[in-house]
From Swiss-Prot:
Its main location: host cell. Ca(2+) binds at residues 120, 123. InterPro entries: Rotavirus_NSP4 (IPR002107). It is a single-pass type III membrane protein. The keyword rRNA-binding does not apply. This is Non-structural glycoprotein 4. The chain crosses the membrane at residues 29-51. Plays an essential role in the virus replication cycle by acting as a viroporin. Creates a pore in the host endoplasmic reticulum and as a consequence releases Ca(2+) in the cytoplasm of infected cell. In turn, high levels of cytoplasmic calcium trigger membrane trafficking and transport of viral ER-associated proteins to viroplasms, sites of viral genome replication and immature particle assembly. The secreted form acts as an enterotoxin that causes phospholipase C-dependent elevation of the intracellular calcium concentration in host intestinal mucosa cells. Increased concentration of intracellular calcium disrupts the cytoskeleton and the tight junctions, raising the paracellular permeability. Potentiates chloride ion secretion through a calcium ion-dependent signaling pathway, inducing age-dependent diarrhea. Residues 1-28 are lumenal. It comes from the Viruses. Glycans are attached at residues 8, 18. One of its GO terms (biological process) is viral process. It comes from Rotavirus A (strain RVA/Human/Philippines/L26/1987/G12P1B[4]). One of its GO terms (cellular component) is host caveola.
Length: 175
């Protein structure tokens, strides 16, 4: 029954506000009247909704200051959204939470950078060791005279043994 009475009271106050506005603004060409009435209706509704919420919150909460602050910030944020603003009011607690989150993310990224840097240093050292093992070391001058095909290059007199080693030999087999 109390809720019904409260609803009737709310409706009668809204009607009273509308009647008062109609009598004050008798000019039928008033273009801003619907907007003014809407804003006043929203303000009254917020007022009626916030008072019982605040009473319950203050009775049940041990930390009433934070509850009051949170309710006021919520009401102002609602009004800002209704007005079309995208910005919001934040409390110091929310700012501290966001700063803690940012600091935690920065620490995580610094640790990741440190790990990646360590891995890159290890990879560079590994590549240096591989490069050192693969380095060609000069062993001095190698005599390649015996290694190339000299059949078409040297004559019979120029061979060391005096004969061409590439010519076929006569082989006799015993029968």
């Amino acid at each position: 029954m109390e809720k019904l009475t409260d609803l009737n009271y709310t409706l009668s106050v809204i009607t009273l506000m509308n009647n008062t506005l109609h009598t004050i603004l008798e000019d039928p060409g008033m273009a801003y009247f619907p907007y003014i009435a809407s804003v006043l209706t929203v303000l009254f509704t917020l007022h009626k909704a916030s008072i019982p919420t605040m009473k319950i919150a203050l009775k049940t909460s041990k930390c009433s200051y934070k509850v009051v602050k949170y309710c006021i910030v919520t009401i102002f944020n609602t009004l800002l959204k209704i007005a079309g603003y995208k910005e919001q009011i934040t409390t110091k607690d929310e700012i501290e939470k966001q700063m803690d989150r940012v600091v935690k993310e920065m620490r995580r990224q610094l640790e990741m950078i440190d790990k990646l840097t360590t891995r890159e240093i290890e990879q560079v050292e590994l590549l240096k060791r591989i490069h050192d093992k693969l380095m060609v070391q000069s062993t001095g001058e190698i005599d390649m005279t015996k290694e190339i095909n000299q059949k078409n290059v040297k004559t019979l007199g120029e061979w060391e043994s005096g004969r061409n080693p590439y010519e076929p030999k006569e082989v006799t087999a015993a029968m």
